[in-house]
């Protein structure tokens, strides 16, 4: 085994099989961080995780079956019961998922009975090797098939890859496939490619890796998840997919799968999240002019909304720590929502309104909004628990322009940049002469 270690074991070398593992005894498995494990006895943790994984697969299957049942059920009176079933099975499978993932965290915690950083590192490096291995293999497969030299895996995560099949679809059906064939037929074709070609190839590729590493048991497998006709990545782990089929559940209308963007973040006002999702749907099927009209119309609607609906939700902590007893009510570097909370409390006391309204306390959920200056509070922000006291007279000072920019336009501009669209019509010299 010293012969193996002396070659410098790491993920990059194992990916290219540049480490000779022929000297490794048959009853020993190597992990990418250079650790060795015996194979004559199965450890309690792998055995326990295997049982949990089987349970999760069972509940996940029931969850997906219920989702498809909901898609096919036209009777609204029956849909409620199906939705309850979906929620139950989803909660059960997610609970199992959290339990499975927590095993890695436990191995890296000094308070765990079997804490060992070598074990935790073995898990992370094995994950890196597995996902990068299949990424390379799939790129090789697609390049050999299409006689190209490019990357077809456009992104990868800890346990998944994102593969573009547009070139394959064009080769089989022609470049005008979007015009002459329904999208559902293209999705059917992609589904067959994944099930009949890619999944068996992935299984074969992982067997090759398992044999090379002399694993205890080959458990690595990949199943097709989402089939989409369009997708956008704004950054790593921040993307949108226009999904027609998710893990075998075929949607009557495409569903947006959104990861890491403001539209799914609780720090974005709920009314704004709804409009963000509407705009993303329009981006997927509309034009730049449609988007510009949508933004213009929503801006008018936005300015008519009450401050409570357009303000940022936050949890507030550190009111006492950031408060100042001098002429400045807060110290330098105070977070903006905490600054607003300090101002809110100060003026409640100054205006003797503490019997009518409660002070903001540590740990409470609040909202904050930007103010136009000058204003009675001589500051640029106000926070509040539910609504702004009418006695403050601040409603007319809410900076709707800045709120619109911060809550809606700036986050959506990132998505518009991906497709090269402008939020507003830009006049050009060429357009002037037309």
For the regions a protein language model found, what residue spans apply to each?
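Inter-lobe coupling/hinge region of RecA-like P-loop helicase motors
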Residues: 109-122
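Short glycine-rich loop/turn motifs that provide flexible caps or phosphate-binding loops at active sites
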Residues: 42, 104-107, 419
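Core alpha/beta catalytic barrel or barrel-like domain that forms the active/cofactor pocket
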Residues: 104-110, 153-162
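DNA-dependent DNA polymerase catalytic subunits
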Residues: 1-33, 40, 48, 67-88, ...
